[in-house]
Every structure is written in structure tokens, then in C-alpha cells.
């Protein structure tokens, strides 16, 4: 082992102060890293060296510099690599095998299971319903007068506990509708270079199962072409749609109202080559196909976007 493995790009590091010590918590949406895993903050200066190109000899040299020039044996550097590898935060063969297994399991499942039940909201159906009903009953902070029934809603996707009144105001505006189907758009936090990720899975929460319009998802995915991710794995851990679905399930008979779940990625890089994202491959045809689906009978369709107008994080 002469070259250090690269750090995983799909995990987050959070610095915390615990029992008088600075620690680094590792947040892994795949669940490969133990939820209780923490690193000593002393290892922080060495983490940038794990880029897939730095030699273990360079790690050894940096370690000596940080220890005031004291001799550091190669075995000490190797021990750091072994510890990080064992935790599951490096791009090793064992990590790739674990990720492949998790990806296959999700791809082969007909359902997208609730990811945040039991952490961001109760996993118990009765308790979850009570929490949502309490939020929906919160008094309005200001009166909103609409010229007619809304056809689209932009709602937050932050933790329910942080934006209760905003969620209440948003979903109060659509509670009297009777949509025949719902286009569910959300910020995709893990889409990489893909513009969209479209899922045809049945979404489940403690409140029940919500089917996808599989014919429509296939049609729209085909229209998007290379703008759409070839799979829907980004939906596995994404919260932006899951939070919207909970409120929709309290307002409408969602087991009978199919959804079209779409995660949307970033497009900033497109402006280096085009004036409008619609000029990029697949995006205009995606928009046209979605618009056609919204206009199709029977009944009226509702668009719900789990997005923040000024998105950070």
C-alpha cells in the first residue's frame, strides 16, 4: 500500500465537542459507517491527504511535522489508514462491495421505504398522524388570499420541527383540493451531475403506501434521456419528497392518488455553454412531457415542490 485510498464523497463530517474533547462525527446515509462512529479531531489535518494520489510516505512526513519533528514510523501511518478503512470512510474494495449490495437491494425493491421515520418524525403510525395533525392545525401567521384554487405549491423541505408554521401555511392552501395525481418535485441533494432522478417505486411511510404513475414515469424518463439519472438510487435517502408526502397523506387519500416523484439537481454548470437550461440535452423534452402529463385528463393534477426558494445545504 503506497498510495492512500480516497475519502468517500458521499459522507459528511461534523465537528462536535464531547466530554471535553473535540471529535469528528461521521454521517453516512448508506449506513456503512456505524451511527456512533467518531474520529479524534487530531486526525483532521490528515484527512485531505486521502485523495487517491498521495503516498503513505507523504502522510508519514505530515504526521512528523504535526508532531514537532518527532520520528513517526511507517506503521503509525499505516495504522491510520487501517482505522479509517475499518470505519468505512475510504473508497476501498470493501466499501465498493457494500455500496453495490445496497444499490442492488434498492434497485430490486418495488418500494421506497421511509428513510427518516423514527428520527425526524415518529415511526408509529398513530404518533406520526398526531404530529402532522398538530402542525396542520397551527394558526395562520398571516392571511393569504388566493384568486382561485392553487394548481401548484412550493413548500419547505427542512426538518418538520424547524418549520412547523411554514408547513402548516403551505398545506392549508391546498387542503380543499381533490387532485387526481400529484407531480412531486424535490431538491436532489445527492444527484451528482444528473439533472433529474425519476422513480417509479411505491413510496411508503408510517401512514401508508403511495403508488407511482409507472406509465408516466417511464415516458418522462425516456423524454429526459441523458438529463435523467439511469437509476433512482438518489431517492433512497432523500428527505425533500418524504416530508411532502407525509402532509399529502393527511390531506388526501394518497393510496388512490398516484405520484410522479422527481428529484431535481443543480444546473449552474450549464450556463458555461448555454444561455438557458432548456438548450441543454433532454431538459426541454423533459419539461414538455411533464407539461403534457399535467394537462392530461382525468381530473386535475397538483404540482408540489419540496424546495426552498433560497436553498442552502
Provide a role label for each language-model segment.
Residues 22, 30-125:
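Long, charge-rich, low-complexity alpha-helical segments
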Residues 7-20, 60, 64, 97-104, ...:
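Short, charge-rich amphipathic segments
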Residues 3, 16, 27-29, 80, ...:
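Homeobox/homeodomain signature
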Residues 110-313:
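Active-site histidine-anchored catalytic micro-motif
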Residues 1-33:
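Long, low-complexity, charged/polar intrinsically disordered regions in eukaryotic proteins
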Residues 1, 23, 63-64, 254, ...:
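Detector for methionine-enriched segments
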Amino acid at each position: 500500500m503506497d498510495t492512500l485510498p480516497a475519502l468517500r464523497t458521499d459522507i459528511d463530517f461534523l465537528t462536535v465537542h464531547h466530554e471535553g474533547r473535540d471529535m469528528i462525527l461521521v454521517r453516512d446515509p448508506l449506513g456503512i459507517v456505524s451511527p456512533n462512529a467518531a474520529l479524534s479531531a487530531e486526525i483532521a489535518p490528515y484527512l485531505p491527504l486521502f485523495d487517491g494520489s498521495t503516498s503513505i510516505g507523504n502522510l508519514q512526513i505530515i504526521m512528523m511535522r504535526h508532531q514537532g519533528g518527532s520520528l513517526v514510523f511507517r506503521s503509525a501511518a499505516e495504522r491510520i489508514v487501517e482505522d479509517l478503512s475499518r470505519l468505512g470512510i475510504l473508497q476501498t474494495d470493501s466499501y465498493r462491495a457494500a455500496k453495490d449490495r445496497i444499490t442492488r437491494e434498492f434497485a430490486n425493491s418495488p418500494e421506497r421505504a421511509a428513510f427518516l421515520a423514527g428520527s425526524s418524525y415518529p415511526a408509529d403510525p398513530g404518533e406520526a398522524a398526531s404530529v402532522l395533525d398538530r402542525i396542520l392545525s397551527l394558526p395562520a401567521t398571516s392571511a393569504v388570499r388566493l384568486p382561485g384554487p392553487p394548481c401548484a405549491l412550493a413548500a419547505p423541505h427542512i426538518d418538520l420541527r424547524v418549520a412547523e408554521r411554514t408547513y402548516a401555511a403551505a398545506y392549508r392552501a391546498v387542503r380543499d383540493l381533490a387532485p387526481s395525481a400529484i407531480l412531486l418535485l424535490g431538491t436532489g441533494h445527492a444527484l451528482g451531475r444528473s439533472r433529474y432522478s425519476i422513480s417509479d417505486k411505491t413510496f411508503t411511510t408510517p401512514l401508508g403506501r403511495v403508488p407511482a404513475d409507472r406509465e408516466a414515469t417511464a415516458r418522462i424518463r425516456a423524454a429526459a434521456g441523458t438529463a435523467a439519472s439511469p437509476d433512482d438510487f438518489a431517492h433512497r435517502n432523500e428527505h425533500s419528497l418524504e416530508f411532502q408526502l407525509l402532509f399529502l397523506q393527511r390531506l388526501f387519500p394518497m393510496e388512490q392518488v398516484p405520484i410522479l416523484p422527481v428529484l431535481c439537481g443543480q444546473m449552474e454548470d450549464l450556463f458555461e455553454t448555454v444561455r438557458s437550461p432548456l438548450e441543454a440535452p433532454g431538459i426541454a423534452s423533459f419539461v414538455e412531457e411533464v407539461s403534457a402529463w399535467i394537462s392530461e385528463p382525468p381530473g386535475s393534477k397538483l404540482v408540489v415542490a419540496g424546495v426552498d426558494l433560497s436553498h442552502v445545504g
